[in-house]
Amino acid sequence: MGKGILSLQQEMPLEYIGKSYQEVLKIRQESYWKRMRSFSLFEVIMHWTASLNQHTCRSYRGSFLALEKIGLLSLDMNLQEFSLLNHNLILDAIKKIPSSKASWTEGTKQVRAASYISLTRFLNRMTQGIVSIAQPSKQENSRTFFKTREIVKTNAMNRLQTASFLKELKKINPRDWLIAQTMLQGGKRSSEVLSLEIDQICFQQATISFSQLKNRQTEKRIIITYPQKFMHALREYIGPRRGLVFVTSSGKMVGLRQIARTFSQAGLQASIPFKITPHVLRATAVTEYKRLGCSDSDIMKVTGHTTAKMVFAYDKSSREDNASKKMALI
């Protein structure tokens, strides 16, 4: 499938060198136009999203299936038909979907719109501009994108809840208990911990080195220091093995669904009033580091956030607990 779609970008034969620019341009556009009829929107989306990271791939594919379900798009149409659509109108329609037709939150609508824009950008490049790029509205009263909340929706545990959660998790699965502690101390995403290799650990210095890849290009190395008690437990768990740190009984990488299940179960057993997901641990780490008085720049060195604004979004401590509560200026 991939090679077929890449055939959209065939080079022009040398026999056209003697022709004028306008003639060659017309021939090239016609050639692209004819080939576009051979590809369905569905196969293009499947090819394109396969090149994205797992989370984005799943999100984008879900978006297009949802758009087809409510009748805004047909995945069976070919690229010629898709290129003739008014993409800006479709963006506007996504934002104006009534709740009677689809119970989408504003955040969901913006994800659907972003998916659509990304697709048109990809196809604009693949078709040498025949498919136009959908343009988001920037008018004050009808913006396609705007901030829906100041902080992330994810809950964070307090110290007592964290201790209770870890206690229950250890009873359920000691390996997942180690995974949770690795995530908490470093404010790490589940993917960063589940893919961790043993050679990234330095037991002598009690550190673990994490690599974050931004936009699949810029690599950022983050070193997290762990308590000796934890490192001892981790060393005992690993034993003489090599390769991945956390593995299943068959030696494979632990899946996200596995820890999502045990984390949720431990949260229930600890009587925590909200569902514990892997992402809750990241929000908990930021909130706890802030409570302990760490600066945003120090927290960024731990979590890998690129701006203080992102740290603020994850900080779930009370907004009343600020400088005005600690000192009086009048």
Curated annotation (Swiss-Prot):
Active site: 189, 214, 279, 282, 305, 314
Matching Pfam families: Phage_integrase (PF00589)
GO annotation (BP), single: DNA integration
Annotated signal peptide: none
Record keywords, A-Z: DNA integration, DNA recombination, DNA-binding, Plasmid, Viral genome integration, Virus entry into host cell
Residue ranges constituting the Core-binding (CB) domain according to the UniProt record: 39-124
DNA-binding recorded as keyword: yes
GO molecular function: DNA binding
SUPFAM superfamilies on file: DNA breaking-rejoining enzymes (SSF56349)
UniProt domain Tyr recombinase: residue ranges: 152-327
Family from the record: Belongs to the 'phage' integrase family.
Full protein name: Virulence plasmid integrase pGP8-D
